[in-house]
């Protein structure tokens, strides 16, 4: 902060790690006290508490994650681990439906920790 004051440059905290609502509130207040701007990420996350709202995880989502984590360095390997496409489309369609705000779960504790009205 001495550098900030000496050089007349604003400080900004662009992103922090995931923590508890209590930690987030404490850190946010500390930043506010010393006039450091901040951003907490993200607005929506899949089945998580550390975001403004949580997107419900669709049944079968792990199949997509497993495919993405599999060795796909050769076409033969891709074909070997490739999941059923109609099932993947169904899972992704459910995911897109779940992303609609009306289907998300608000994380009131997270919002309150940021000093906002949930």
Describe the function of each predicted region.
Residues 3-117:
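Substrate-binding cleft of secreted/luminal carbohydrate-active enzymes
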């Amino acid at each position: 902060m001495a550098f900030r004051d000496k050089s007349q440059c604003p400080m900004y905290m662009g992103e922090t790690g995931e923590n508890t609502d209590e930690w987030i509130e404490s850190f946010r207040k500390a930043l506010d006290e010393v006039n450091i701007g901040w951003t907490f990420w993200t607005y929506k996350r899949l089945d998580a508490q550390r975001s403004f709202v949580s997107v419900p995880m669709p049944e079968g989502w792990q199949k997509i994650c497993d495919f993405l984590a599999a060795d796909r360095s050769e076409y033969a390997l891709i074909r070997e681990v490739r999941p059923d496409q109609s099932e993947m489309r169904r899972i992704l369609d459910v995911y897109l439906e779940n992303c609609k705000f009306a289907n998300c779960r608000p994380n009131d504790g997270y919002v309150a920790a940021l000093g906002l009205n949930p």
